[in-house]
Amino acid sequence: MSVDYVLQTSDLVKEFKGFTAVDNVNLNVKRGDIHALIGPNGAGKTTVFNLLTKFLIPTRGQILFNGEDITQMRSAEIARKGVVRSFQISAVFPHLTVLENVRIALQRKEGNSFHFWKSDKILDKLNGRAMELLESVGLQDYAHTVTVDQPYGRKRALEIATTLALEPELMLLDEPTQGMGHEDVEVVSDLIKKVSKDRTILMVEHNLHVVSKLADQITVLQRGAILTEGDYATVSADPRVKEAYLGVAADEEETA
């Protein structure tokens, strides 16, 4: 039986002047999986995300989504196809309410301009769906509170809600638990697991506890190239991964 891949890259390369940031990466993301992209700082993880969403143009290689070549498509077209990215840096509007932020995302899905100036009555038609999305991430009780007043974990949940508003088939999560305390990490991890139902998630994540808890498949990058792949048990047992993260070869560690 053939494997159903929602996203594939073939010999993906990104070169800057005198530097190769992504080096012949062949990524295969299985439909319905939570797939983690990990590696030490500077490994090329975020650059891969930027290539997938056309924030950067590949030097060489091919990107396939549902078997269709999207390598030359623009960012907006890729998003309309169903590849939607939730950013590492907060992308919500801090001085709008939680509900208003989700309504803005829903307007994007409809292809409209952002009607900040229109009366609530005109935008009320979006409230039902917005509240459904807030309920899906546990924010329904905070719908009418100002976003800037929310703790970091709730802001992250709101970012996920606004991403869900665009109905992604493939959700790209860039460091979803970065900067969080333990309690928020657990809440957001549980939320990612919940929203992964009926969709595929590709995430960049440094927290290996989160990766071990969530990821069906892991790809480890080092210096822009794939070091190894597999489930958490396979990857964590690979001495090259320990060396990449700790800078110490496994045999050196044993004799230390």
Model-found features: residue ranges?
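Glycine-rich phosphate-binding loops of nucleotide-dependent enzymes
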Residues: S2-A256
